[in-house]
Regions:
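Ligand-binding beta-strand-loop-alpha-helix segment within the catalytic cores
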Residues: 2-79
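Conserved active-site and cofactor/substrate-binding residues in soluble primary-metabolism enzymes
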Residues: 17-21, 35, 39, 53, ...
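Hydrophobic/aromatic beta-strand patches that form the interior of the parallel beta-sheet core
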Residues: 68-70, 119-121, 149-154
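Active-site rim loops that border cofactor/substrate pockets in soluble metabolic enzymes
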Residues: 72-117, 126
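Short, solvent-exposed amphipathic alpha-helical segments in soluble enzyme
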Residues: 85-89, 134-141, 166-170
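Hydrophobic alpha-helical bundle architecture
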Residues: 114, 128-143
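Short, flexible loop segments at boundaries between secondary-structure elements
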Residues: 143-169
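Conserved small/polar residues in nucleotide/adenosyl-binding loops
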Residues: 201-203
Length: 203
């Protein structure tokens, strides 16, 4: 058996390959067109609702409650392997993931919202995507407010290019986040997030 490591998490390679093949199977049955990651994750939710052995996963729970999940770097994951397998099997007619349409959809959500805030665990592509909706809206000629608040829980340090090379204070200089209501929390998320959630439950 092979073991894969993702940061501090160990995964059975055989189980991971089952996931890849399942993604391929889901894609094979879909209408041939472009999908945003949100649309494709809805299809994963539908599949899990019928076929999952273990209930209560994040994706299935989001599907049950009509909560959208966006994954801007969807292809930069094991699930991306499943889509490559799908395209290899169907070279002429296959689905694609449209990250540009997805960014446009996220921007439209920002444009339509009365106010917005960010709660980020980690960083990377999702952090940049959601912050940049403010700038994208302005480039489209829409007058939008900055995100009113932002909290980021991370162990990354911006000095060496990690943390997406910037703290939330720097994000405020781009007009993305209100600088008076931002907080960097330098901590391991699994030790901090449960405390935050518990506090919210008891408010």
């Amino acid at each position: 058996n092979y073991i894969d490591r993702i940061y501090d998490t160990y995964i059975d390679e055989n189980e991971l390959q089952i996931c890849d093949k399942t993604i391929c199977e889901i894609a094979d049955k879909l209408e041939v067109r472009s999908y945003t990651s949100r649309e494709f994750i809805v299809e994963i939710g539908k599949y899990l609702k019928i076929n999952s052995k273990k209930k209560g996963s994040l994706i299935e729970t989001a599907y049950d409650n009509n909560v959208p999940i966006f994954c801007p770097a969807f292809t930069d994951s094991s699930a991306g392997f499943g889509l490559v397998m799908h395209q290899e099997k169907n070279p002429e007619k296959h689905i694609t993931i449209d990250s540009i349409r997805e960014f446009r959809e996220l921007t439209e959500i920002k444009i339509q919202s009365k106010g917005s805030g960010l709660f980020m665990i980690g960083g990377g592509v999702p952090k940049n995507f959601i912050q940049d909706t403010v700038i994208c809206a302005e480039l489209l000629g829409k007058d939008v407010d900055m995100h009113k608040y932002a909290i980021q829980i991370t162990v990354a340090d911006s000095r060496d290019g990690a943390c997406s090379s910037s703290t939330l204070k720097e994000a405020s200089s781009w007009g993305k986040v209100n600088t008076t209501k931002e907080q960097m929390v330098f901590a391991e998320a699994t030790s901090v997030l449960p405390l935050v959630i518990l506090s919210l439950i008891h408010i």
